[in-house]
Amino acid sequence: MSSSSSRNAFEDGKYKSNLLTLDSSSRCCKITPSSRASPSPPKQLLVATPVEEGDYPVVMLLHGYLLYNSFYSQLMLHVSSHGFILIAPQLYSIAGPDTMDEIKSTAEIMDWLSVGLNHFLPAQVTPNLSKFALSGHSRGGKTAFAVALKKFGYSSNLKISTLIGIDPVDGTGKGKQTPPPVLAYLPNSFDLDKTPILVIGSGLGETARNPLFPPCAPPGVNHREFFRECQGPAWHFVAKDYGHLDMLDDDTKGIRGKSSYCLCKNGEERRPMRRFVGGLVVSFLKAYLEGDDRELVKIKDGCHEDVPVEIQEFEVIM
């Protein structure tokens, strides 16, 4: 792969980024004859975008179970500051175990990006949808894999260039998957036509916070199983001593925000895990979307001096 200049992926990049909220009442930023009739997004979207003029790859981030997209704003701004447009839909407010509606909504939003997103961004910013990454955290990670696999009746015409699972979870335990089950328990069974995949795991995700609460990323349905079913190229990193929700914002408001500190086994603070996840995502995207693999190789070789956590496990399938 070729090289290009870049900053340390685990710190903020060179681009100033802003947050935008788009919903059915949002007005277009770019007033053109076509924009006047541009459709509103199917779901409320939180967008982190560079403000400098340019074309930028697009990354969709699907939130975890009963979480708000706003809880990921610090992570989104970190990744966006390296030259990416982040899109985080609010897929639901209340949901049962079935994820089919989320799969359907994600495919619909992906289709909307091609016709609607450009009209709602700052005039000087252009989304490059030929470089599109689909990512998700927890239940959102499962949803991202489900959409990419295209075997549940809903898919998008937008090509997925890379796929990222951030501590993905497919249920409460082996044999207790939430419908529709994504994991097949067959090694290398995810046929994604050589789409590059990044799977990030939390070292404490398999550990219950106390006897009253089950683990947030239980064995048998977590990042390990997702990676086992991947075909190459696929990368798997596990952060030691950090938990399933440690990549969220420091200040997550409301009852759901406060409960995010109480339900899972957590690390000492969120910033290191959030920076780790953001840096891995940036390094992976730079490698597979931009052709600059220097930081990803340094992380793989254990010689990146700025990794903010201890890497407990690392695997790669090429």
Curated annotation (Swiss-Prot):
<dbReference type="InterPro" id="IPR029058">
    <property type="entry name" value="AB_hydrolase_fold"/>
</dbReference>
<comment type="similarity">
    <text>Belongs to the AB hydrolase superfamily. Lipase family.</text>
</comment>
<dbReference type="GO" id="GO:0015996">
    <property type="term" value="P:chlorophyll catabolic process"/>
</dbReference>
<comment type="pathway">
    <text>Porphyrin-containing compound metabolism; chlorophyll degradation.</text>
</comment>
<feature type="short sequence motif" description="GXSXG">
    <location>
        <begin position="136"/>
        <end position="140"/>
    </location>
</feature>
<dbReference type="Pfam" id="PF07224">
    <property type="entry name" value="Chlorophyllase"/>
</dbReference>
<dbReference type="InterPro" id="IPR048264">
    <property type="entry name" value="Chlorophyllase"/>
</dbReference>
<comment type="function">
    <text>Catalyzes the hydrolysis of ester bond in chlorophyll to yield chlorophyllide and phytol. Does not seem to be required for chlorophyll degradation during senescence.</text>
</comment>
<dbReference type="GO" id="GO:0009507">
    <property type="term" value="C:chloroplast"/>
</dbReference>
<keyword id="KW-0963">Cytoplasm</keyword>
<feature type="active site" description="Nucleophile">
    <location>
        <position position="138"/>
    </location>
</feature>
<keyword id="KW-0378">Hydrolase</keyword>
<keyword id="KW-0881">Chlorophyll catabolism</keyword>
<feature type="active site" description="Charge relay system">
    <location>
        <position position="167"/>
    </location>
</feature>
<protein>
    <recommendedName>
        <fullName>Chlorophyllase-2</fullName>
        <ecNumber>3.1.1.14</ecNumber>
    </recommendedName>
</protein>
<feature type="active site" description="Charge relay system">
    <location>
        <position position="244"/>
    </location>
</feature>
<dbReference type="InterPro" id="IPR017395">
    <property type="entry name" value="Chlorophyllase-like"/>
</dbReference>
<dbReference type="GO" id="GO:0005829">
    <property type="term" value="C:cytosol"/>
</dbReference>
<dbReference type="GO" id="GO:0047746">
    <property type="term" value="F:chlorophyllase activity"/>
</dbReference>
